[in-house]
Amino acid sequence: MQLHLSEPPLTQGECALVYCFAASGGNGRFPLPPEIASWDEKAWSGLVAETVQEQGFQGKPNSSVALRLTGEIRKLVLVGLGDPAALTLEALRRATANGLRQAHSLKAKQVMLSLPETGLDRVRGVQAVAEACLLVAHRDNRFKSSAKGEEENSFSVQEVTLLVPGLAQARPDYEVALQRAIEMAAGTILARELVAAPANIVTPLALADTARQLAQEYGLEVEILGQEECEALGMGAFLGVAKASDLPPQFIHLTYKPAQGDPVTKLALVGKGLTFDSGGLNIKTDSRSIAMMKTDMGGAAAVLGAARALAALKPQVELHFIVAATENMISGHAIHPGDILTASNQKTIEVNNTDAEGRLTLADALVFAEKLGVDAILDLATLTGACVIALGEEIAGLFTPDETLAQELQQAANLSGEKIWRLPLEEGYFEGLSSIVADMKNTGPRSGGSITAALFLKQFVEKTPWAHLDIAGPVWTEKDAGYNNKGATGYGVRTLVEWVLARQAAAACS
């Protein structure tokens, strides 16, 4: 999709998308926006007002009206924003996506989108609208065999012009916002496609190849550690999980450094990279559950998607992107329940459940990250079903002992629209991981499962500020909603980018 910036007003075009705030009272005749009311009276003989009245459109959130017309504007979409005082960037994204879905239903190829006057930061509004346009248009047809099937599943809208009031006064700022949206959406789409691809396509080797491609395209440093290198570093937890797979483990380390000048801060982003999780000898028995275990590398996908976006945006920040990639399979080499593994920080782990393998791979990844001397570590993982039970399928769980980091990540999530909710790191629950033969077990009681999982990870970070995002719920959706289509969402990429850019801005001001 091509995106352009231009000045209002609406003049002519195939399709116009116009935002509408909710009418006061909400039950009377809806007042059309002035620009549309004028067109309706002069060119459309009141057809728009009549249709709006018939359909009961009142400008409420998630509501819209789509019409075919004659004249210089041949198709029109009105989309509701609700109460202007309650409008958020995420509501603007969702309304934009709703409107573009309606434009798609009209088979529109070109859309003129008139940005509303709101209380939101206008530059941020342009970024949010552009993100929604690019993300709702994404269709993953890689594995369809026929051109006809691909055409039927493609998004009709190919070009959107954003009409921005006051564009001329701050065009450079708007162009920066547009480019940021383009790169963030591209990173999100990369993450979506990694998560959506089956485990026979996205293997540990394929993730490593993706990292190499990013390094080549964006000038990143890349280090891929194989079995022997990981053994030399004492990564017994990671390699314990990897033992049963016929595919070799790949420990991925991408590094971005500013081209000029010293970095204002150094950060590590760590993603869980289980390209398939059978459960191991504690095999998953639910056929639906095991079929979806291609998504168990959603954290790795978010980290690689963020690497793609941030390398293009070039912040003055040193960034380390880390993924311990492997499968959790069943074979004669598989770890047994009761085995003891030694992680690279020399802590020992009794494996009382082989289906709690992600935290084992993350243990060595976190130790590796801290040794890099970074200022903060953030890991993302599709870690626990318990978090999905607690927060549902749209919200990630945030765990951190660091108040500043918690606030930073919440602010980043507010900007991205990717929902997070902080859950407690209740230290007393670590008793549930106690072992009589090792330093800890890898799982505790069923109750508080997402908390004990986070407490387990905490044992592998000594001093560096650290946060953990459990993204098991929002990494996938079973319905078209907002700018996400059914399937992989690419969750986490935009929050990571917003967090890194905010850390850069804060460091530059200090």
Swiss-Prot record:
Gene3D superfamilies linked: Leucine Aminopeptidase, subunit E, domain 1, Zn peptidases
Keywords: Aminopeptidase, Cytoplasm, Hydrolase, Manganese, Metal-binding, Protease
Gene Ontology CC terms, in alphabetical order: cytoplasm
Protein residues bound to Mn(2+) 1: 277, 355, 357
InterPro entries linked to this entry: Leucine_aapep/pepB (IPR011356), Macro_dom-like (IPR043472), Peptidase_M17_C (IPR000819), Peptidase_M17_leu_NH2_pept (IPR023042), Peptidase_M17_N (IPR008283)
Keyword Manganese annotated: yes
Catalytic residues (UniProt): 284, 359
Its EC number(s): 3.4.11.1, 3.4.11.10
Note describing how the cofactor binds: Binds 2 manganese ions per subunit.
UniProt binding sites for Mn(2+) 2: 272, 277, 296, 357
Reaction catalyzed: Release of an N-terminal amino acid, Xaa-|-Yaa-, in which Xaa is preferably Leu, but may be other amino acids including Pro although not Arg or Lys, and Yaa may be Pro. Amino acid amides and methyl esters are also readily hydrolyzed, but rates on arylamides are exceedingly low; Release of an N-terminal amino acid, preferentially leucine, but not glutamic or aspartic acids
Location(s) in or outside the cell: Cytoplasm
Name of the protein this chain belongs to: Probable cytosol aminopeptidase
Gene: pepA
